[in-house]
Amino acid sequence: MVSKTSLRETVRGHRWRELGEVLAARPDLLNVRDERGRNWLHLCCATPGDPADSIRTADLLLGLGLGLEDAAFTEGEWKATPLWFSISWGKNYPLAEHLLKLGAAPLYSLFAAIWNNDSATIRLLLAYGAKVDEDSAPGESPLMGAVAWSRFGPAATLLEAGADPNLVNPKGDTALHMMLKKGSAIEHFRLFARHGARGDIPGAKGETAASILRRKRDPAFRALADELATA
């Protein structure tokens, strides 16, 4: 007898042939969701595995009517779509690329790729139209998220793609202010300086990043203040 539990394992195992047979016999199980709102497509995408089998499984479920943009749950404008699951949990670049080729919106997933330190997927999302400074997370750009999580590889990828290094978060700080508070290494400040970060923007406490840098003991940090852009 087929149960939701056994079907869950079939989906997570990307056993697409078996899944097709089960759903042909029990079409009433197609639209089942778990306690977090995830359907079978979300679970398929969230589970790491063989790329080819995961793509066949996803195509089967899409062909049976599950939605490419259907969200398991939402937070404001942000949505946990199948694409997001393929990137955040599945870490499955080929599946993510396949979903994008099918027309999946490249929204909501940049932060997941940043958290995973996955610059290749960041570039993939941008190539399919993701906005480098998207605002799906209230008050925080992807670049700000990269700095907050000390993901400076992704930060470099975003800056190279044109991310604005001078945005201000809801607290009133720029990325430079955040890095000063975190004690980030000087090479990360130099990265931002190379991409036009301004040192003359007041932060939450009214001080500019340049003025804070000039008070540092390390002469390299003091010198960096003069490398920062100004209005």
Q: Where do the model's predicted regions map?
A:
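Ankyrin-repeat-protein effector appendages
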Residues: M1-S6, A105, A161, S184, ...
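Ankyrin repeat structural motif
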Residues: R15-L23, D50-G63, G90-L100, D118-A127, ...
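Eukaryotic tandem repeat interaction scaffolds
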Residues: L110-K171
